[in-house]
Amino acid sequence: AAKEAAEKATEKTAKETAEKAAEEAGIHCRRGVIATGDRFVADKKLNDFLRDTFHAISCEMEGGAVAQVCRAADIRCAVLRAISDNADEDAAETYNGQKTLCATIPVVCRALELYFS
């Protein structure tokens, strides 16, 4: 029971730390379900299905694999995502990964600084 309580406290602290770092950077932050799969979602119908069925606020292709490996190895992890497109028919044209990545790096660094200080 003590281990579970410590894990929940750590999880809460990690989430709050990430949110605080994003807020300090003036970046909108949302917490919620992120759907993950093995393909780039560029289809409004599929996007709507994921949102309606799983209440997903986003979808991606990498975080689920990392989380699964961490779970198998009994290693705790958190996934922090930056949204780069709208996961619809215009996704390929609206993808702006480089700009999103550049905006995200300082937030991740600040979150780590806050978490470990």
Language model segments and positions:
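Glycine-rich phosphate- or other oxyanion-binding loops that anchor nucleotides, phosphorylated ligands
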Residues: 1-2, 14-117
